[in-house]
């Protein structure tokens, strides 16, 4: 395994660890999820470049589209929750409430 792959895997696991540690705040969780998507994008790009297959080149682009949709939905939810409740604490949200 090359040093670049090791660094990218470490970045992914640190983002995953950050998601587990900072799960009480929605903004911190969204930032860690974006870090995870960025490392997955870099890993898929490196895999596509090493495989020399033209079909593999579409996977990073599709992943970027899903990451952009995830970021937009996450920021919209964050804005709605912070306007409604005044905070981004996940513990204050009751998802069973209608």
UniProtKB/Swiss-Prot annotation:
Transmembrane segments: 2-22, 29-49, 61-81
Membrane-protein topology: Multi-pass membrane protein
Enzyme Commission number: 7.1.1.2
Domain of life, per lineage: Eukaryota
InterPro entries, sorted: NADH_UbQ_OxRdtase_chain4L/K, NUOK/Mnh_C1-like
Main location: mitochondrion
One Gene Ontology cellular component annotation held by this UniProt entry: respiratory chain complex I
Oligomer and partners: Core subunit of respiratory chain NADH dehydrogenase (Complex I) which is composed of 45 different subunits.
Stated family: Belongs to the complex I subunit 4L family.
Protein name stated in the entry: NADH-ubiquinone oxidoreductase chain 4L
Originating species: Calomys laucha (Small vesper mouse)
